[in-house]
Amino acid sequence: MAAAAAAATVEAVGVAGGRRRRSGSVALGDLLRREASAERASASASAGAGGRERERRPSVAAGQACRAKKGEDFALLKPACERLPAGGAPFSAFALFDGHNGSGAAVYAKENILSNVMCCVPADLSGDEWLAALPRALVAGFVKTDKDFQTRAHSSGTTVTFVIIDGYVVTVASVGDSRCVLEAEGTIYHLSADHRFDASEEEVGRVTECGGEVGRLNVVGGAEIGPLRCWPGGLCLSRSIGDQDVGEFIIPVPYVKQIKLSSAGGRIIISSDGVWDALTVDTAFSCARGLPPEAAADQIVKEAIASKGLRDDTTCIVIDIIPPEKISPTVQPAKKAGKGLFKNIFYKKATSDSPCHADKDQCTQPDLVEEVFEDGCPSLSRRLDSEYPVRNMFKLFICAICQVELESGQGISIHEGLSKSGKLRPWDGPFLCHSCQEKKEAMEGKRHSRDSSSRNSGSSE
């Protein structure tokens, strides 16, 4: 009956228009069949495109090696993680944790940091939206991990270097001095920051302004020895997870860099300071060139121990991002390392033995590794102040760090001047719960929770 009525309606329209077009009459059943057929064709095309996209994605192979001295280094290798809810392309996650003053913080971070980061990513994002949300989620996940661990009243701490690989996009978040380095098409790129006080005058200034004291260890006679350290506690790092006995100004806010590799792929090395205190970056890559990841990591650790002995836990993770057309990874000979922070893109750098040195005309179009995102600012307010995708507005009324749901009047805006606002308005967010706001204030030096102690005391690292 409904189909007949629909056909009659189509025919009547033809008559009203002054022309009788029985050939234009279409039954509702035919319309539905055509629409279903079109949807099937569209779904098939999408599936084919998705399959082709998966075929174009690189494979990821990884291996690790460790020689223990104190038993405080830990590694996380998850080459195939699934985004939830299911449907998105899989990603890989790798992390290195170099603990100090005990292994508690390193073990806790290894067990919790991935889930803490992922719970800060809104659900149902497209691939590009998911990648764009990662830098903020990494900041929130690191701070949540630190905040939750400190409720356990442990005095240990840990560095964290956390790597997420999605296709050719690599996102790295780091606190501490466990460096992450990439070699792509013969060029070396530094993807992490060094948070030792000796490496950053800005971090020395930040900690001092927040109430900490930075100096070297005093010995008998008034001489100062060793690296710069923060007192109380004697920690030589300005950022870490844990370290409750040192001070809240030792913050867990990570340096984050996101890059996109060319289709040539590349090799990544993540190592604790047991490796980097013994080997240069060039040596680490060259001594393991041509080896698969597991053997490469083992070789790098062996070289480090042969150079300086086993003075500390020595851990290495090697990750190969392999283009689909390559059966096995091929790592190009290394050129001079690019160092420091890069803006927008990385350019290949030639050394004296590079073909570019002999013929500059052949190097006018260098291959690029695109920098998508970079931020190492210690301000939690700035690092969390980025918008969610519009279709995930409901997340605005959840604490940006611990992800608890906020009721009316409970949330505190991260923006200055709005922290005492009673009624939540979407444009005032993101928001923090009261306990996360206290954590933020302590990290900024607005609330001191530790007593000072002498620089003559023992050191944490």
Swiss-Prot record:
Tissue expression from the record: Expressed in leaves, leaf sheaths, panicles, nodes and internodes. Expressed at low levels in roots and stems.
Stretches of the chain forming a coiled coil according to its record: none
Chain ranges of the PPM-type phosphatase domain: 57-321
GO molecular function: metal ion binding; protein serine/threonine phosphatase activity
Cofactor(s) it depends on: Mg(2+); Mn(2+)
Highest taxon listed in the record's lineage: Eukaryota
Name recorded for this polypeptide: Probable protein phosphatase 2C 40
